[in-house]
């Protein structure tokens, strides 16, 4: 097993590295992860997406290698577009407890269908 595979397989989300946020100002962190992959729970075929993560930290920020490893743990999992983005959102919201957070998964088209999933802490339900 190569070292990258080992790091991904051994990654434990419970021990995701987070750092204290010592900044006194409010600011937004924007992270783009253009190589997201998970497997379709029905067919097992790979699904690819770009993940856009934005958040306004409160007391904590995520270490960038930790978010990369966490995102890469999805590559061998059979999980839907919706479930993967909701899981990423919930995990980061619970770990970081940010003032505001948004996670968007922009999935590559499959079978002429393009899907974008968005979770955000200020979601307003349309009437």
From Swiss-Prot:
Where can this protein be found? Answer: Cytoplasm
Entries under Gene3D superfamilies matching the protein: 3.30.1130.10
Q: Which domain of life is it from?
A: Bacteria
SUPFAM superfamilies, A to Z: Tetrahydrobiopterin biosynthesis enzymes-like
User: What UniProt keywords apply to this chain's record, in alphabetical order?
Assistant: Cytoplasm, NADP, Oxidoreductase, Queuosine biosynthesis
What the entry lists under InterPro entries is as follows: GTP-CH-I_C/QueF, NADPH_dep_7-cyano-7-deazaG_red, QueF, QueF_type1
Q: Which residues form the active site?
A: 40 (thioimide intermediate), 47 (proton donor)
Q: Which GO terms describe its cellular component?
A: cytoplasm
Q: Quick one: which pathway?
A: tRNA modification; tRNA-queuosine biosynthesis
- Give the E.C. number(s): 1.7.1.13
Where substrate binds, per the record, is at 62-64, 81-82
Name the top EC class: oxidoreductase
The yes or no answer to whether the keyword Mitochondrion is present is no
Q: Provide a GO biological process annotation.
A: tRNA modification
Q: Which family does it belong to?
A: Belongs to the GTP cyclohydrolase I family. QueF type 1 subfamily.
What job does this protein perform?
Catalyzes the NADPH-dependent reduction of 7-cyano-7-deazaguanine (preQ0) to 7-aminomethyl-7-deazaguanine (preQ1).
Q: What is this protein called?
A: NADPH-dependent 7-cyano-7-deazaguanine reductase
């Amino acid at each position: 097993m190569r070292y990258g595979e080992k790091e991904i397989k051994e990654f434990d989300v419970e021990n995701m590295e987070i750092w204290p946020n010592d900044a006194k100002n409010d600011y937004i962190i924007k992270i783009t992860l253009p190589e997201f992959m998970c497997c379709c729970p029905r067919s097992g075929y790979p699904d690819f997406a770009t993940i856009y993560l934005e958040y306004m930290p409160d007391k904590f920020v995520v270490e960038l290698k930790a978010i990369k490893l966490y995102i890469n743990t999805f590559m061998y999992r059979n999980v839907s577009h919706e479930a993967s983005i909701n899981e990423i959102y919930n995990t980061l919201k619970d770990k970081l407890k940010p003032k505001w957070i948004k996670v968007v998964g922009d999935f590559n088209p499959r079978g002429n269908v393009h899907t974008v999933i968005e979770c955000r802490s200020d979601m307003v339900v349309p009437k």
